[in-house]
C-alpha cells in the first residue's frame, strides 16, 4: 500500500471537534493509547493518531478504488444520515443510512431477493403499471415500494457483497460490523472513546457524535475513493 499525502490538518480537525470523546465514565480501556488527556469530565482523543489512521484508511480506499473495488458506507444515526448519503453518492458507493436490517450481508440471498423485488416494483411504477391496478392493490404495492426505498434505496445497485465497508459509529452499527467480521469483509470504522479499536481492520479514533467531525472524516475518505476511481478509469 503506497502512502500518499491527504491534506489532513490537525487544526481543521480541532475546529470540527474531532478530538472530543465521551465522558470519562463511559470509556473503553482499550482506547487508552488513543486518548491524550481528560478535560472537564471528557476524554480528549490524540489527533496525531487520528491523522495517522485516517491517512492509512485513505491509502487503503484509494488503492482499492484504483482497481475497481466496491464500497459500502454504513451510518444510520439520524444526524449523520444525510451526510452518509451525500458522501456515498459523490463517490459512487453503496450506503445504508436508515437501518441495518439484520442479515443484510450474512444472509445475502434474502437481501438479493428483496433487491430484485425492489427493482421490479420501481420498473412497474415508472411504466405506470401500478396506476392501472385496483386501488387497494396499488396502495399496498406503493407502501411496499416506499418501505424498500427507505431501507434498500442506498444499495439498489448492489449485485454482490462489498469489498470494503466504512462504518460511521461502531456501537450504533455493531450488527453490521459483526456481519463483516463473520464474512471477512475488511472494515474501516470511526471509533469514539467508548469503542473497541481492535474490531475493525482500520479504526479511526474520532468524535462520532458531532456532525462536523463525521463530515470531515467522510470527506477525506470519499475524496480518496474519487481519486482512486479516476485512476482506475484512466488505466482502463
From Swiss-Prot:
Keywords: Chloroplast, Plastid, Ribonucleoprotein, Ribosomal protein. GO terms for molecular function: structural constituent of ribosome. GO terms for biological process: translation. GO terms for cellular component: chloroplast; mitochondrial small ribosomal subunit. CDD domains: RPS2. InterPro entries: Ribosomal_uS2 (IPR001865), Ribosomal_uS2_bac/mit/plastid (IPR005706), Ribosomal_uS2_CS (IPR018130), Ribosomal_uS2_flav_dom_sf (IPR023591). It comes from the Eukaryota. The keyword Plastid applies. The keyword Acetylation does not apply. Pfam families: Ribosomal_S2 (PF00318). It is found in: Plastid, Chloroplast. SUPFAM superfamilies: Ribosomal protein S2 (SSF52313). Its main location: plastid. Belongs to the universal ribosomal protein uS2 family. This is Small ribosomal subunit protein uS2c. It comes from Calycanthus floridus var. glaucus (Eastern sweetshrub).
Amino acid at each position: 500500500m503506497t502512502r500518499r499525502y491527504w491534506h489532513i490538518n490537525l487544526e481543521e480537525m480541532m475546529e470540527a471537534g474531532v478530538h472530543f470523546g465521551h465522558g470519562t465514565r463511559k470509556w473503553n480501556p482499550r482506547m487508552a493509547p488513543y486518548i491524550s488527556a481528560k478535560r472537564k469530565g471528557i476524554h480528549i482523543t490524540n489527533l496525531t493518531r487520528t491523522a495517522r489512521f485516517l491517512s492509512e484508511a485513505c491509502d487503503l480506499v484509494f488503492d482499492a478504488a484504483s482497481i475497481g473495488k466496491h464500497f459500502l458506507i454504513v451510518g444510520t444515526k439520524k444526524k449523520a444520515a444525510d451526510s452518509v448519503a451525500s458522501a456515498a453518492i459523490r463517490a459512487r458507493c453503496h450506503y445504508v443510512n436508515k437501518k441495518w436490517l439484520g442479515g443484510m450481508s450474512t444472509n445475502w440471498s434474502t437481501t438479493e431477493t428483496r433487491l430484485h423485488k425492489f427493482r421490479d416494483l420501481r420498473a412497474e411504477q415508472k411504466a405506470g403499471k401500478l396506476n392501472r391496478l385496483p386501488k387497494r392493490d396499488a396502495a399496498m404495492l406503493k407502501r411496499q415500494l416506499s418501505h424498500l426505498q427507505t431501507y434498500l434505496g442506498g444499495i439498489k445497485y448492489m449485485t454482490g457483497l462489498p469489498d470494503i465497508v466504512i462504518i460511521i459509529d461502531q456501537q450504533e452499527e455493531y450488527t453490521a460490523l459483526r456481519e463483516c467480521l463473520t464474512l471477512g469483509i475488511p472494515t474501516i470504522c470511526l471509533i469514539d472513546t467508548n469503542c473497541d479499536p481492535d474490531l475493525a481492520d482500520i479504526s479511526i479514533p474520532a468524535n462520532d457524535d458531532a456532525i462536523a467531525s463525521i463530515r470531515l472524516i467522510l470527506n477525506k475518505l470519499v475524496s480518496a475513493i474519487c481519486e482512486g476511481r479516476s485512476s482506475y478509469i484512466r488505466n482502463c
